Structures are given as C-alpha cells and as structure tokens.
Amino acid sequence: MKHKFLFSVFIIFFIFVFIALGSWQIIRLNWKNNLILEIENSLKNPPVELSKSNKENFLRIKTSGTIDFEKQIYLYNLNDSGTPGFEVINPILIENENYLINRGWIPFEKKDTLEINIFDQNDITGTLKTQGRKNIFKPDNDIEENYWFSLNREDILQFTGKEFSKYIIYLDGNYQFPRPKKITANISNNHKKYAMTWFSLAISIL
C-alpha cells in the first residue's frame, strides 16, 4: 500500500513538472511571437537618420560616412541559393563612431577586385543588427589571408586597430556585387513544438 502511494506521488509530481515546463514554453512562444511581430513592423518602417540616441536592433537607417577599403573583411558565407562566397564587410566612420557595414555577398572570384568597391558612401540605407554569437564549430579566422569565418571582436581589433559599435549596418539597395543581404525576422521559434512535447509526456504517464 505504501509503495503504491509513493508511486502515485511520484507520478503526480512528474505530471506537474511536465505541465509547468509546457506552460513555460507557451509563455516563451507568446514572447517570441510578439518579438517577431515587432521586428517585422520595424523592417517595414521608413529609414531614419542614424544618431547616437536612436540605435536599436533591426532599426532601418540612412546615413553617410567614410569607408575604409584598406581594411575590408571577407567573411565566408553562403548566398540565398546556397553558393559559397564572401560577405564584404568594411569599417565605416559615422559621426566619430566606428561601425562595421556588411555590404553583401560576392563569389570567391570577386575577392579584391576593384568593381566591388564602386559604392556611394554618402548615401547609405541599411538595417542595424547586433552581431550573433560565434558558432563553436567554425574554424579560426585567417587574418593574414583575410579569410574570415566569424566576426571575432579580438580578431577585428587586431586586423583594423579599432573597436566598433555592437551594431552592424546591413546595407540595402539594388547592388549587383556585393549583393546586399536581405534582413528578415527569421528567428528560431520552436516553443510550440517543445510545449506539445512536455504536455504529451504529462498525458502519457496518466
């Protein structure tokens, strides 16, 4: 009798745990959905003049500055079709503050060609975005060959001798090469699946 009672307590405890975990995922799901909606609305807004007082993630901006083509960074990445190449990233000085501007993707053979630097730095429209975390499975950057796999801040400081804003400017526009990267609200949102898993586990042990 005692063992049966303890077993029932054990089962009830885990049912409550699974329900609590499922409920937490529902809360996270609502938060994530609201965040995605905010980002989508922000990306639909017209660009505003970049200033020190209005910087935020996914803010569309317009500005001008002085680009450093000598310290141009070539970041390995795939384009939307899955073709490997480089994203071209430059230091840019805007109102005495250093930023990195991601001008878009090029195929490998365009690296170090003059045509990719035909660019009007006095008429820049783009989107601010904070840098994502480094994937631990990516190789180290080859700074000497200017072949990058991540925007490691220590490597960037070594390469450029400068520190930069946490916001990267992703260029908008109809450029052929580099081809600007389209910024979307494509954020991982698996909370519904996780919630269903926890609730299913709670039901399965009834």
Question: How should these model regions be labeled?
Answer:
Residues M1-N54, L59-L206:
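Surface-exposed, charge/polar-rich loops and edge strands
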